[in-house]
Amino acid sequence: MNKNHLSKRVRLLKINEFFFVFQKPQRIKVHSMTLFSRSNKLNFPRIGLAISKKYIKHSHERNRIKRHVRETFRTHKHNLLSLDFILTVHSKQILSLTNNNLIEELKKLWYHYQNYQQKS
C-alpha cells in the first residue's frame, strides 16, 4: 500500500463520531465551506465530510470537492492537533471555484489549525 494514502483510522465513519463533533464544535467559515472541529483523545487528527446534494447536485462535483479536501488534509495532518474535523458545504458558490482556488481555500482552513497549534 502507498504510504501517502488516507487510512480509515483518520476518517470519521460512524454516525456517533459525527454527532460528537457537532455537539460542541469550534467553527471556521471560508468561501461557502464550514469546518467544524472538536478535540479527540487520540494522538492524531481525523476528518469527516458532509457534502449534501442540496447544494451540489452533481456527484462528480461532490467527488471533486471531497478529493481535494482529503488530499489537503493528508498533506497537512502531521502539523495539526488531535482534533476531529467535519467539513460541510453551505452554498452553491463553491462550484465557481477552480481546483486551484479550492485548494487555496482549504489550505487556509488547515493553516488556521497549524497556527492554533503553535499558540497553545
Curated annotation (Swiss-Prot):
Reaction equation(s) it catalyzes: Endonucleolytic cleavage of RNA, removing 5'-extranucleotides from tRNA precursor
Superkingdom of origin: Bacteria
Keywords: Endonuclease, Hydrolase, Nuclease, RNA-binding, tRNA processing
Family listed: Belongs to the RnpA family.
Residue stretches in coiled coil: none
Subunit structure: Consists of a catalytic RNA component (M1 or rnpB) and a protein subunit.
GO BP terms, alphabetized: tRNA 5'-leader removal
Functional description taken from the UniProt entry: RNaseP catalyzes the removal of the 5'-leader sequence from pre-tRNA to produce the mature 5'-terminus. It can also cleave other RNA substrates such as 4.5S RNA. The protein component plays an auxiliary but essential role in vivo by binding to the 5'-leader sequence and broadening the substrate specificity of the ribozyme.
Its EC number(s): 3.1.26.5
SUPFAM superfamilies with a match to the protein in the record: Ribosomal protein S5 domain 2-like
Enzyme class, spelled out: hydrolase
Record-given protein name: Ribonuclease P protein component
A single Gene Ontology CC term: ribonuclease P complex
InterPro entries given in the database record: Ribosomal_Su5_D2-typ_SF (IPR020568), Ribsml_uS5_D2-typ_fold_subgr (IPR014721), RNase_P (IPR000100)
The species this protein was found in: Blochmanniella floridana
